Amino acid sequence: MNPQELKSILSSGLLSFPVTDFNAQGDFHRAGYIKRLEWLAPYGASALFAAGGTGEFFSLAASEYSEIIKTAVDTCATSVPILAGVGGPTRQAIEYAQEAERLGAKGLLLLPHYLTEASQDGVAAHVEAVCKAVKIGVVVYNRNVCRLTPTLLEQLAERCPNLIGYKDGLGDIELMVSIRRRLGDRFSYLGGLPTAEVYAAAYKALGVPVYSSAVFNFVPKLAMDFYHAIARDDHEAVGKYIDDFFLPYLEIRNRKAGYAVSIVKAGAKIAGYDAGPVRAPLTDLTPDECDMLAALMDKQGKQ
């Protein structure tokens, strides 16, 4: 799949990022991950991101990363394109990017580098180095320490033909509008704020109709139904989903830092697809919080 074909796929439909399965000892659980992918693939997501943020990329060892990407690519070979999360220091990000390409990933989600503060020029050089190390398409994730400006994104687009997507995790509307207007159809644009459904209608109005769904991991039918309501501008249905599910969900998610990942794993367990515990420094939901989530999920009906 060439970068432009990937760009076309990412320009419509719902995207998601499966959680990564761990066993009770916290090690990668391949069989559980395969079962998860086989369950989710038929629901109709346009693409899945393996080892992304919700997949706990930040806690994976290099050897685990290879096994996770290979498992995802092999399992979904005939059903849905797999993009691989990459990130961290530049040389590490390049190694992961090249490994994901070797294993058959159709594209990459370039997550922010960690901890080190850097100038805009330095971040742009980091993105360019990763893009030029591979031939497959790359989506850059503006979030936390990665805050690329429209001017730098325009320069990167000129220098890196395989940079085909921009994912926004900042929620800076002025910046998002500026990037969308400046870059036009050069990129596919993805909404990437945590629990992106809450912002989906607003982002669609800005020209960003595509987003990645975390709740697809445990209420996939609801996630797809909500996406279709957004796509057809059914404001009444969208409002009902937000009132009945997403706002109560946020009340649980916002109880502790890091719960944006933990609550997804809790939901998967309640749905019958236990992915095991999160890895430190994240913490799992408490039993009471799991009960609250289970009650909320039960109200949504069979998935």
From Swiss-Prot:
Pathway: Carbohydrate acid metabolism; D-glucarate degradation; 2,5-dioxopentanoate from D-glucarate: step 2/2. It catalyses: 5-dehydro-4-deoxy-D-glucarate + H(+) = 2,5-dioxopentanoate + CO2 + H2O. SMART domains: DHDPS (SM01130). One of its GO terms (biological process) is D-glucarate catabolic process. Keywords: Lyase. One of its GO terms (molecular function) is 4-hydroxy-tetrahydrodipicolinate synthase activity. Its EC number is 4.2.1.41. The keyword Lyase applies. Belongs to the DapA family. This is Probable 5-dehydro-4-deoxyglucarate dehydratase.
